[in-house]
Swiss-Prot record:
The keyword Transcription regulation does not apply. NCBIfam families: L21. This is Large ribosomal subunit protein bL21. This protein binds to 23S rRNA in the presence of protein L20.
C-alpha cells in the first residue's frame, strides 16, 4: 500500500491561524439587545444614526474570546474593549403582520410594520488598543 504524503506544515499553520480567527468573538450590547459578533461578518442591527461607509465603535462589550482560549468577562463591561463596525447599508426587515381577533365577535384588526435596520460589517475586535482580529 502506498503511504499518504505528510501534510505541509505551512498549510497546517495557515489552517490553524484561520481557525483561531474564526474562534474569536465578542458579545456586545447595542440598542437594548445583546449580539454575538465575529470578525469579517455582517449583521443587521436596529437603525443607527450613521451614514453608509461610516465607522461606528461599540464600547459596551460584555465578553471577549480570542482564538487562544482566553475569555474575558466584564462586570458588566470589559474595560478598554471595543468593536469597530463599518456601516454597509440601511435596509428594512421583513413585513411583520399583527392580527388581533376576538372570537364570536366581529372585531378584527390587522396591522403590520417593517423594522428599520442597519447592516454592519465587523472590522475589528480590540482590547486595550490591541486588535484581536
Amino acid at each position: 500500500m502506498a503511504e499518504k504524503p505528510a501534510a505541509k506544515p505551512k498549510a497546517a499553520a495557515a489552517k490553524a491561524e484561520a481557525k483561531d480567527q474564526s474562534d474569536s468573538y465578542a458579545i456586545v450590547e447595542a440598542s437594548g439587545q445583546q449580539f454575538w459578533l465575529q470578525p469579517n461578518r455582517y449583521y443587521d442591527l436596529d437603525r443607527l444614526q450613521a451614514a453608509v461607509d461610516d465607522t461606528v465603535t461599540l464600547e459596551n462589550v460584555l465578553l471577549i474570546k480570542d482564538g487562544k482560549n482566553d475569555t474575558t468577562v466584564g462586570q458588566p463591561y470589559v474595560k478598554g474593549a471595543s468593536v469597530e463596525l463599518k456601516v454597509m447599508d440601511h435596509r428594512r426587515g421583513p413585513k411583520i403582520i399583527v392580527y388581533k381577533m376576538r372570537p364570536k365577535k366581529k372585531t378584527r384588526r390587522k396591522n403590520g410594520h417593517r423594522q428599520e435596520l442597519t447592516r454592519v460589517m465587523v472590522q475589528s475586535i480590540s482590547i486595550d488598543g490591541k486588535a484581536l482580529s
